[in-house]
Amino acid sequence: MADTLEFNEIYQEVKGSMNDGRLRLSRQGVIFKNSKTGKVDNIQASELAEGVWRRVALGHGLKLLTKNGHVYKYDGFRESEFDKLSDFFKAHYRLELAEKDLCVKGWNWGTVRFGGQLLSFDIGEQPVFEIPLSNVSQCTTGKNEVTLEFHQNDDAEVSLMEVRFYVPPTQEDGVDPVEAFAQNVLSKADVIQATGDAICIFRELQCLTPRGRYDIRIYPTFLHLHGKTFDYKIPYTTVLRLFLLPHKDQRQMFFVISLDPPIKQGQTRYHFLILLFSKDEDISLTLNMNEEEVEKRFEGRLTKNMSGSLYEMVSRVMKALVNRKITVPGNFQGHSGAQCITCSYKASSGLLYPLERGFIYVHKPPVHIRFDEISFVNFARGTTTTRSFDFEIETKQGTQYTFSSIEREEYGKLFDFVNAKKLNIKNRGLKEGMKQSYDEYADSDEDQHDAYLERMKEEGKIREENANDSSDGSGEETDESFNPGEEDDDVAEEFDSNASASSSSGDGDSDRGEKKPAKKAKIVKDRKPRKKQVESKKGKDPNAPKRPMSAYMLWLNANREKIKSDHPGISITDLSKKAGELWKAMSKEKKEEWDRKAEDAKRDYEKAMKEYSVGNKSESSKMERSKKKKKKQEKQMKGKGEKKGAASKSSSSTKSSAKTMSESFKSKEFVSSDESSSAESKKEDSEDESGASPAQSSEDSASGSD
């Protein structure tokens, strides 16, 4: 066997970033060289305590644990390389390379185990995930929760920010499981610890974001905010800028600390720490350092004993420790003499401060916009009232900020400031126009162009012209719209007849001088009588045999009274639940007894159904025969009625034919007179009588034959 093993393209995970390198195993130990950073991990063979082989995202991985608790992980091995590594570990390190699979059940509950520098979350004996405690930057506790925050790697595309564990309470007295969990994490985590005494402490300072009162402890490398509910440790390296801003009432001061990354409270992130001070509040401050240390460290910026306004002391100490300048408002002065402008942003009102290199808005939510990231600004007239305007800022990234409800008196000062800073103004040249527009709205000018008024004037002119035309022709009655021929056609179409419109109706219409719209005749359609939909619903036959019950229902009917006696006063629903629980808990042998009873009941039911169906068939055949007989009788009666109708129709037809023949054969020279007409009528009457008698006799004979 070779004395060394070398592997290329092996990856090491560093705070979420996978760094490739070369891994070399020899008799002396394990060496990994990072290709990106050049960092070398050297693990002595005598320090190795355990080796684990497992399947990971990048193929297979090797996990090495040392005797002093350090853990090293290397990924990117092929499955075929296990035998080679296992033999090498046995031969040179006298260790068994154990195979362990990760749990992939997807459960979010399990057991947490602390081993060396690792926190392992296990389900049963299989680990789900592992957290290197050296990556933990913050550990905070809640009622039943522990939240871990992690150091970030700038090279990682996706980073794990925090993990929250729910720790259930235990019955043990004097042991808080949440606190015990947090202490296990903090003992190995790379968390900022408050070692030594604070340089100074400011008690009960009012904080607007995050809201509350906090004690601020100043340490050499970080700032500690201690409140009733939350604690924050803020390293000075995360402080970007400091602002000291006077309130508009000239009695208060804002001290703003800009942070990156922000502090977090639950899911809320605070990029700005805003403290509010009263100008009248004074303090005497003594630093917890001797004068030589103060002089050496701060080089005259601070002294051991200081006194003055509280906001001055806080800002002075922060400036010296953070080593950053404090930004104050520039030479901008508003209409009221203040260095800020009252406005609204989103749903809250606040103060906008024009600075020398940007704008800052306090306090809810705080916004800081630098001039170098502004694309352009825009002055817009207010939407609800003309006594205010909106100030819009659009950044080069496309983000838009709208500060609304700014008093119109501030417009001139703000416009001059923006112009002096050489910012791009989207609607440049509207300064004079905007001032003029306010005057016009205060007292409208006749020269102002109003599109709506112009349109109304045009409509008025058109109405006047139409009125003049109608008055000129009011004495004459015109019949241009009246067309008798067309009207006749309409009527003919509507009533489906050849009748023409009467002259009297036409005269009446012309007299009135108005043409009423013709009413359309309703076309009556012959509707067939609706057939009643007879739903043939088969009623349940009371004589039919009842369906058999299941094994559970047989058991329940037999044991219902027993359950009631065991649980007096139990409701119906609770009884059903209890019965279900008892049935589930019953052994298989006892259930088989009731299953047999259910099978017997089923067989009896099938037998009864066969007998019932045979009886039903005989009854149904009798019913069918009676129905057929009834239908035959109805048919015979219907045939008799039809014969009678035919006879009556034939008699009436002979009568009408005789009459038409007598009327049709008349000569052209025939002159009608009273006598002739009377004689003719008599003749017709006699003919009618003679024609009726034979018809009657024929009907009688027909009835006799029937």
UniProtKB/Swiss-Prot annotation:
Composition bias type Low complexity, residue spans: 497-507, 647-664
Cellular component annotations (GO), alphabetically ordered: FACT complex; nucleolus
DNA-binding region: 545-613
Chief location bin: nucleus
GO MF, one annotated term: nucleosome binding
Biased composition (Acidic residues): 474-496
Superkingdom classification of source: Eukaryota
Annotated spans, Disordered: 458-551, 587-706
Subunit structure and binding partners: Component of the FACT complex, a stable heterodimer of SSRP1 and SUPT16H. Also a component of a CK2-SPT16-SSRP1 complex which forms following UV irradiation, composed of SSRP1, SUPT16H, CSNK2A1, CSNK2A2 and CSNK2B.
Recorded family membership: Belongs to the SSRP1 family.
Protein role: Component of the FACT complex, a general chromatin factor that acts to reorganize nucleosomes. The FACT complex is involved in multiple processes that require DNA as a template such as mRNA elongation, DNA replication and DNA repair. During transcription elongation the FACT complex acts as a histone chaperone that both destabilizes and restores nucleosomal structure.
Name under which the protein is recorded: FACT complex subunit SSRP1
Organism name: Gallus gallus (Chicken)
Lineage, highest ranks first: Eukaryota, Metazoa, Chordata, Craniata, Vertebrata
